[in-house]
Amino acid sequence: MFFLTDPIEDRAKDWLDYKINYQATFAAQLMYPAVDTYEVMPWPDRIYQGLYQVAGTDRKERIPRDYSTQMQIMVNTLNDIRTSETQVSGTHGIGVLMANSLMFQRFPDHDGYDDPQFSSFYGQTLPLLKRGIPVELVHMENTPFGDTFKGLKVLVMSYSNMKPMEPRYHDFLADWVRKGGALIYCGEDIDPYQSVLEWWNSNGNQYKAPSEHLFEKLGLDRVPAAGTYPCGKGMVTVIREDPKHFVLKSGNDRQYFDAVSAAYRKSAGKEVELKNSFLLERGPYTIAAVLDESVSDAPMELSGVYIDLFDKDLPVLTHKVIRPGEQGYLYNVKRISGRAKAKVLCGASRIYDEKAGKRSYSFVAKSPLHTTNASRILLPKQPIRVCVNEKEAVSYTHLTLPTT
């Protein structure tokens, strides 16, 4: 799997807006420790040569040097990112079911039914995410594989915004529930796509909605009322409301969240952890995000020795504050393993031909034209001379790192 983040967007916005969104999506992709392959710049010429609006003006210009420097620093770190067994902070084991057919129902308004801005999907995920739960995405097409349900305690699903392409998926879902899983079904099953000619209403099947087939497999009535039902060692909770209403109506997600909390308590034997942030360590990299519209307005405060990778100047910090609506991407210097060896820790250029001697360290740095190179270099001792292109550097900063 490759994750794609784009330093700009197709919609017409300004450079500042692009930068804010890029930081958010970049941090989000790093929150998946099982993925370490990325597409970093779709069509680089449009990023470096395109003209886009400057915030607060009608003027358009090419990418600001501050932003191109920061962008290149961020992209270069991906060369060092590896998969890891670490987990994002928070309660794990709560998932939301999705299927390929999600894309079949993108038409926003049909026969009096609408699902604006993918609201049914976000209605299932955002009430959990905004409370600090790292909700997992479970693909219906993967249910035949046993590892799909590994570690999963609660699974939320709805057929208001997608449909099962094959009836056999219901067998795997029902088997998981009977073995102890907690399934939460949200939906009124009234969208017009319920009546399209498909397997549940053809070839001898006479189900008015695919959920009727699922509930039958679970040993329930075809159209069960709202409530919680036992099923083998597990349980099924039915909420008769389309999940889009959990986000389209202010404060309307309480019943849904309470149902998820109760199911997790029953299945896992402990409470859901509520918080307003996410934190993940991947090697020396610290990725953090603090949420707005959450359970608290408190910022996240980190102490240590960090290089700020969202800052073009790569400042070394001993204290970092991340406020609601912001993200942080830091290089934790204290996590450097082994004895200190000369190396470029981070920077806005690609590094080639590194040569480390007993008293010297050299390398070739390459980056795009009309961009600024900034680097943080780790050395075992304080340098006597620093030369760039065989000329002594006029300006550089030297910091002695603490030994503890």
Predicted regions and their residues:
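A short, well-structured beta->alpha microelement
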Residues: 127-147
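A conserved amphipathic helix/loop scaffold
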Residues: 163-358, 375-377
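Short acidic/histidine-rich motifs immediately flanking catalytic phosphotransfer sites
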Residues: 150-155
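Short strand-turn-strand beta-turns centered on an Asx-Gly dipeptide
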Residues: 387-391
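A general structural detector for well-ordered alpha-helical segments in enzyme core domains, enriched
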Residues: 25, 124, 169-173
